[in-house]
Amino acid sequence: MYTAFLSCNLGKSHWLQPAKWMYYHLLDGDWGSNALSWQWVVGSFSHKKYIANQENINYYTNHKQSNTFLDVDYEKLALLETPPQLKEIENLKLTTQLPITNEINIDPNLPVLIYNYYNLSPTWRAEMKANRILLIEPDIFKAYPVSDQCISFMMKLSKNIDGIQVFVGNFLELKTKLSGQTIYFMEHPLNSHYEGIEDEREWIIPDAVNIKGSYFSFWKKNEQYIKGRFELKGDQC
C-alpha cells in the first residue's frame, strides 16, 4: 500500500505499470489480487485515494524516520506536490526467461494431471497414478511476466511433486503429445482454454454468492467464520 501510494498518488504514475513491476517480483504473486490492491489504493472504485504520512509508516513498520517529504500532517499531505525523488517514471520492459527442458516421457496408459504456475499443490490428486506435467505456457508469461527468482521458486516447488515433468509450450502443443488420455487440471481464470476434467479450487467461503457492498462489509459478515476455519488447535499451534 505504501509503495502504491508513493508511486501513483504522490508520484502520479498510472497504477498499471508499477503493479506489473511488483507482480514481476512477487514469489507468491497473483495478478488479480495484486492489480485490484493497486486500484484500491489509487481510488479506482471509490475516488478516495489512500495516503499515509511518516507517522503512520513509522508506527506500522517500527521505524523512527523523520524530516522526510512525508513527515507532515494529513491536511498538508493531501495537497503535497510530487517531490523531485518521485518525478521520473520508467518505461518498463519486463520479460521472463523460461527454463530449458528435456523431452517429456508420457505413459499412454495413465491419465494426465496438468500443473502450472498457479497450481503446484503436492496434495492435489496425490493418490492417483498419473503422468504429472508442469505446463509452462510462453503466452501466459508474455502477458504476465515474472522474474528469474519467481521461475526458480516455481521450479523448486515443483520438486515436491513426485514424478513431475516440465513442458514449455501451449496446451494444444502438449495435447498433441498425448494419446487421448483423460486430462485433469485445477480451475483458474488463466486455464479457460484447457480441455479435460476441471477440479474446482477450494474456496475459503464456499457458499459466498451474490457478493455486494464493500470489502470491509463482506469481511465483517464473514470474519468469525474465516477465523474459526483457520484457527490453530492443539498440536497445530
Describe the function of each predicted region:
Residues L172, Y184-M186, E198-D199, W203-I205, ...:
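Non-catalytic terminal regions of proteins
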Residues T176-S179, R201:
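Extended, well-folded catalytic/binding cores that form a central cleft or groove in large enzyme
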Residues L178-E195:
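Acidic beta-strand-to-loop metal/phosphate-binding motif
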Residues A4-K177, N191-S192, N210-C237:
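C-terminal catalytic domain of photolyase/cryptochrome flavoproteins
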